[in-house]
């Protein structure tokens, strides 16, 4: 019942998704500013993370006995009174019975009334805290650090703000059916025993909180992640397997980058060749057919294997061809490989 009321409070207050409802009345005093909680990541089917309280504060996991004197400011937030109906359907009724402990037999809904009154917000002065922890180190021998470090899904967080009640508050739940003229009435007006429940809890009870994640380095230094973009956790040691995987990933990335660069350069080079060829009014194809001019031949017929074209076969991507010219020679080789069109004509146009 308490968890349902705090969830409803957080949903209505909002705060951009930073507020977390306190799950249990018995643990409400463990979500005070500078207290430590463990955030456990779930699988992709459950995007919401689970927060677990701990009996420790930030000072407990730091080396040295110096206290943290960061100031905590407080102010009134709002006056909260809420009444709502919750429908019972399928297996949900069994879950609610276990949660609120009332008899819902024959009922189709329960009415929940939460009276928190004026609630206050207590938050740590972030700038002061960041200055104080600049030279502080984490104690890796602390049991909470050892246990959290061994789990890859656990992230240590520090409570930065809490929302508390200021007076004695009450929660009440009634089971019944929805009426047409009235919002709610009992199934058995003569004997409503077991169909209602109320609890009263003291002032200064925490009902919601927000946290900042901690990122802990191998040398014991740590950062408080003050933005949602920064992620907490532990810096991992570079094992042999991890190092090999990291190097392999970098090699593949670099190789792919080089391939894309070569494709880009090759495409630009070919564009220049084609534009240079087609922009000229005279085609060397006609000239090459005249008597005494250079002839395009198939090099395979002369037992010369195919290879990269001397014009467009440069770079990492070899554009191979079987055609060439025996009347031209390069670097002591008595032939040149040239694509039929347009490399053959462009080569001889430049030679001319």
Swiss-Prot record:
Function description: Peroxisome-associated protein required to protect auditory hair cells against noise-induced damage. Acts by regulating noise-induced peroxisome proliferation in auditory hair cells and neurons, and promoting autophagic degradation of damaged peroxisomes (pexophagy). Noise overexposure increases reactive oxygen species (ROS) levels, causing oxidative damage to auditory hair cells and resulting in hearing loss. PJVK acts as a ROS sensor that recruits the autophagy machinery to trigger pexophagy of peroxisomes damaged by oxidative stress.
Compartments in which it is found: Peroxisome membrane; Cell projection, Cilium
Upregulating conditions: By noise exposure.
InterPro entries reported in the protein's UniProt record: Gasdermin_pore (IPR040460), GSDME (IPR042377)
Known tissue expression: In ear, it is detected in the organ of Corti and the spiral ganglion within the cochlea in the sensory areas of the vestibule (cristae ampullares of the semicircular ducts, and maculae of the saccule and utricle) and in the first 3 relays (cochlear nuclei, superior olivary complex and inferior colliculus) of the afferent auditory pathway. Detected in hair cells of the cochlea and vestibule but not in neurons. In the afferent auditory pathway, it is present in the cell bodies of neurons but not in fiber bundles such as the trapezoid body in the brainstem.
Effect of gene knockout: Mice display progressive hearing loss caused by hypervulnerability to sound exposure. Cochleas display features of marked oxidative stress and impaired antioxidant defenses, and peroxisomes in hair cells show structural abnormalities after the onset of hearing. Mice with conditional deletion in all sensory hair cells show auditory phenotypes with early-onset profound hearing loss and outer hair cell degeneration. Mice with conditional deletion in outer hair cells show auditory phenotypes with early-onset profound hearing loss.
Family: Belongs to the gasdermin family.
Listed name of the protein: Pejvakin
Organism field: Mus musculus
GO biological process annotation, one example: pexophagy
Main location: membrane
Keyword Thylakoid attributed: no
Effect of residue 183 to W: Induces abnormal auditory brainstem responses indicative of neuronal dysfunction along the auditory pathway
Pfam families referenced in this protein's UniProt entry, alphabetically: Gasdermin (PF04598)
Gene Ontology cellular component terms for the protein in this record: ciliary rootlet; cortical actin cytoskeleton; cytoplasm; cytosol; neuronal cell body; peroxisomal membrane; stereocilium base
Disulfide bonds: none
Top-level division of the source organism's lineage: Eukaryota
Outcome of substituting residue 328 to S: Abolished interaction with MAP1LC3B and subsequent pexophagy
Keywords assigned by UniProt, alphabetized: Cell projection, Hearing, Membrane, Peroxisome
Assembly, per entry: Interacts with MAP1LC3B; interaction is direct. Interacts with IQGAP1. Interacts with ROCK2. Interacts with TRIOBP.
């Amino acid at each position: 019942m308490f968890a349902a009321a705090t969830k409803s409070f957080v949903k209505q207050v909002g705060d951009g998704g930073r507020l977390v409802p306190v799950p249990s009345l018995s643990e409400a005093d463990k979500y005070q500013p500078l207290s430590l909680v463990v955030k456990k990541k779930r699988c992709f089917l459950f995007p919401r993370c689970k927060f677990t309280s701990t009996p420790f504060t930030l000072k407990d996991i730091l080396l040295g006995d110096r206290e943290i004197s960061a100031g905590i400011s407080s102010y009134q937030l709002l006056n909260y009174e809420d009444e709502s109906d919750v429908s019972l359907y399928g297996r949900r009724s069994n879950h609610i019975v276990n949660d609120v402990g009332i008899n819902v037999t024959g009922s189709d809904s329960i009415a929940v009334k939460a009276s928190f009154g004026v609630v206050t917000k207590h938050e740590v002065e972030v700038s002061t805290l960041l200055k104080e922890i600049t030279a502080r180190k984490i104690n890796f021998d602390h049991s909470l650090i050892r246990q959290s470090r061994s789990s890859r899904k656990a992230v240590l967080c520090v409570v930065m703000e809490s929302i508390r009640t200021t007076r004695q508050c009450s929660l009440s739940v009634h089971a019944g059916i929805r009426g047409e003229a009235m919002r709610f009435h009992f199934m058995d007006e003569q004997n409503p025993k077991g169909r209602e429940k109320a609890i009263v809890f003291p002032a200064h009870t925490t009902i919601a909180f927000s946290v900042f994640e901690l990122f802990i380095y191998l040398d014991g230094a740590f950062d408080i992640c003050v933005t949602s973009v920064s992620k907490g956790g532990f810096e991992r040691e570079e094992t042999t397997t991890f190092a090999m995987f990291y190097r392999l990933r970098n090699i593949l990335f670099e190789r792919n980058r080089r391939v894309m660069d070569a494709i880009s350069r090759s495409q630009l080079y070919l564009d220049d060749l084609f534009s240079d060829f087609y922009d000229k009014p005279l085609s060397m194809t006609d000239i090459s057919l005249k008597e005494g001019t250079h002839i395009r031949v198939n090099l395979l017929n002369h037992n010369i294997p195919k290879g990269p074209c001397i014009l467009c076969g440069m770079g990492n991507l070899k554009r191979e061809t079987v055609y060439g010219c025996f009347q031209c020679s390069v670097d002591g080789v008595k032939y040149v490989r040239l694509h039929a069109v347009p490399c053959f004509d462009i080569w001889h146009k430049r030679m001319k």
